[in-house]
């Protein structure tokens, strides 16, 4: 039975699904086309550590900010950074990061999975997770310890 459930999940997850997401106060709302079978990410860099990030990177054309552009605020960790963390200026919830990293294919949007309003717990726990060692600036290798992420 488990194998069948896994096979069904695999078939279900092979197609992109449009999810809706928002901040806590609902001033910012978005849609994102995701295929969770492509994998999600958890990182141990100083920023992700602070916000306990669990994300999924997608191409910008798969992301649509529907409402709240005027409430959106951005934070960049370093001067000149090409990565910008977007959060609601009213409730403070971080929704996504956007930027450009050539090594991962250029422009991207990284959606905070915790802000998806219609993501079921079963979909989330079935999604593959890739761990990144941002703390040591070794982004393409899994850190020695991941249980805390």
PLM-predicted stretches and their roles:
Residues 5, 9-22, 27-149:
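A short Gly-Trp-Pro
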